[in-house]
Every structure is written in C-alpha cells, then in structure tokens.
Design a protein with these regions (language model features):
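Terminal low-complexity/disordered tails
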Residues: 1-44, 252-254, 315-353
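Serine-dependent carboxylesterase/thioesterase catalytic core
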Residues: 1, 167, 171-315
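C-terminal catalytic-base region of ester-bond hydrolases, centering on the histidine
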Residues: 55-57, 67, 89-92, 99-110, ...
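Aromatic-residue detector
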Residues: 1, 24-26, 82-99, 112-115, ...
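Acidic-enriched, low-complexity/disordered segments with a strong bias for Aspartate over Glutamate
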Residues: 1, 14, 37, 65, ...
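Active-site catalytic motif of lipid deacylating hydrolases and related acyltransferases
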Residues: 21, 52-193
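Amphipathic alpha-helical oligomerization segments
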Residues: 47-50
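Residue-identity detector for threonine
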Residues: 23-26, 45, 64, 120-122, ...
Length: 353
C-alpha cells in the first residue's frame, strides 16, 4: 500500500489473516549435512522464484544506545526511580546507566558509526559472535547451501550499517543500502526479472522501511521535501558527508524512472521495532518475524507482549520474548554528536514521526 513516509501505527486491532503464529522446533544443526540438504532444496525454490542475491543486513549493539537512554539521562530519567512498580524494569535499566551499557569495554573501543568493511565485520565476529550478528561463517554457510547445485547459484553478501540509531543515521543508512544494491545489480547483471532478498535484523529493518518509501512508484511531495531538506543541510557540513553522493544516486534513479529495470526487493525483518511505515508499492514481498510468547487467556494472541528479564543475567537469553523489539520504538533514539546533526535530525523527524 501507499505509505508516503508516515509513521507506522501502533494498533490493537486484529490483523486477521495477515499474521501467523509458529512454534519454534529444534531442527538440524547448522552447517551439518542435513542443514546443507535443506538449504539446497530452499535454494532451488528461491532461484526458481528469481532470487539471485541475498543481502544480510545488520548492525551491532556494541557501543550503541538501543533504548535512547542518553536522552533519559538528559532529563534525569534514569536517576528518578521511574521504574518503580514495573517488574523487571530495574534489571533492564541496570545496563543503561552511564558508562556501562552505552559503551564498549575500554580495551575494545569500537563504536558506531560502523564501517561496512572486512576489518569491522571481523572484529564483530570475534567479539559478538552470533549474538545479533551475521557472521562470516553464517554467510558462507548460506551461500554454499543455497548454491550447492551449480545450476542455481545465489550470491550471499553481508551489509553492516552504521548502527547510528536516529533518523539521520537510518536515512543515510537507507541511501547507502540502495547504493550497494545498485552495485550488486551491476555486478551480477540483474534486471527486472530478478529478485534480491534482504534479511534485516533488528534496527537494520528500519533502513529497509525507509527504502520502501524512497523507491515508491507514485509521486511524493514528502519525499521531495526530505531530499531538499537533507541536501540543504548537507551543504553546511565541512567536510561534506559521504552520504550526499548516495542521496544524489537515489534522486537520479527516480528522475530517470529506472524502477522498470530494477530487480524486485523482497524483505524479511527479524525483530524490527514498529517505527517507520512500509510502502509496499516500492518493494516486492514483505514478511516480519518477531520472537514473542503469544500466551493470553482472552485468545487475543496478537496483543501478546514480551516478559522483561527479571535479572541482568537473563537479558542475553531473551527467554521472555524480544524486549528490544518491544521497547525500541519512537522516542528511543540515540543522542547525536553535533548541533548541526541534531538540527538535520529534527528536520527529518518532522516528516518521519
């Protein structure tokens, strides 16, 4: 449907047939022969549907502020005991204190903006392992499994976004994502008969949501205003921001009406919070996957929520459901670095919230 950059609605109404409920069952071990056999069958199906490239879109929690605690600090929110009476909230906030949750240990020293390069990805593989991270082993396993038949080759690439969790960071991330997909189109000689499958983890799904609005086929005064506002503010940065070239690339793509020869973008989000709305006219197919526990006595499973961790030790296991997906909604953005960035972010917010 047409969305035109509107914020997604927080609705309690029954989604009906648009939602399904699955129970996780233990399957075969990753990278085993049985796993490869299953991927081979899936790869043939994907290839037959036109998929030629899979993009693993992700960021990292290292050094980030997932819940906007920096802004709470500005008003003293973390110091006023506002969590009183909310089971589990105090244990969650225990990792949001200044110089604790928001920073990597001093001997690690890597924090956003992350570079989408081999060195950064290798560093994350070593320290984050597979916690919110698409590792090189996973990328290679998917590529080899899906393409086990020489007649059905499917490329698999990782795209690490900056992990700057605010409107400016995500918008620039969407520009960069489009630039890299355009590069993949040329590299693999893709056209309108092909499909690119994007698997977006967590906050990275917001980039795909913005991209769906940027690539909308219909005219959009909001899109025009966003481009003009962003370009105007970019002119004040010294040195120029690298994303300006990517913004110009999107603008030129739309002006030349190149959507007709561009591969369809199918998107699967994994635990992405409800933030930006989706314009399904600008993409192919869309699927959201959320890890919650739909246990309710009234039968309204779509209203199920996660259970907050009761102690800090429970936080990495997510036994009560995906609390990051539930809590990282509007007004939880990270603090920006400079007044000029804050000004541009505020200008974007007027059209995105």
């Amino acid at each position: 449907d047409e969305n035109n950059f509107h914020h997604a609605k927080y609705s309690r109404s029954d989604p009906g047939a648009r939602i399904g409920y699955l129970t996780l069952e233990t399957g075969v071990q990753p990278f085993s022969q049985a796993w490869n056999d299953a991927l081979s069958l899936a790869g043939k199906t994907l290839y037959g549907a036109g998929v030629r490239v899979i993009v693993l879109l992700y960021g990292s929690y290292f050094g980030t502020d997932l819940f906007g605690s920096g802004r709470l600090d500005e008003i003293g929110g973390l110091k006023r005991g506002y969590s009183r009476g909310i089971p589990g909230m105090e244990s969650l906030l225990a990792l949001l204190r200044s110089k604790d949750y928001q920073q990597c240990p001093k001997d690690l020293g890597l924090s956003p903006p992350y570079a989408n390069d081999k060195a950064t990805k290798t560093w994350l593989d070593q320290h984050a392992k597979d916690l919110g991270n698409f590792t090189a082993d996973y990328e290679r396993g998917l590529r080899e499994g899906f393409s086990s038949s020489d007649s059905t080759p499917i490329a698999c690439v990782r795209h690490l976004w900056s992990s700057l969790n605010h409107h400016l960071g995500r918008m620039e991330g969407a520009f960069t994502l489009f630039h890299d997909i355009s590069t993949l189109k040329q590299q693999f000689n893709l056209n309108e008969t092909h499909r690119v499958l994007i698997l977006a983890h967590g906050h990275a799904g917001q980039l795909a949501a913005l991209l769906s609005n940027l690539l909308a086929q219909e005219e959009s005064s909001v899109r025009d205003e966003l481009f003009e506002t962003t370009a105007h503010h970019y002119g004040q940065f010294d040195p120029p921001r690298p994303a300006i070239a990517h913004l110009q690339g999107v603008d030129q793509f739309l002006a030349a009406n190149q959507q007709a020869t561009f591969p369809a973008l199918d998107i699967v989000t994994l635990g992405t919070s409800v933030r930006y709305g989706w314009n399904t006219n600008g993409i192919g197919k869309l699927l959201h996957m959320i890890n919650h526990r739909p246990i309710r006595s009234d039968g309204k499973k779509w209203l199920a929520k996660m259970d907050l961790p009761q102690i800090v030790m429970e936080m990495p296991t997510v036994l009560g459901g995906d609390y990051v997906q539930q809590l990282a909604v509007a007004s939880t953005d990270a603090v920006l670095s400079t007044p000029l960035e804050e000004e541009l972010n505020q200008a974007l917010q007027e059209n995105l919230e």
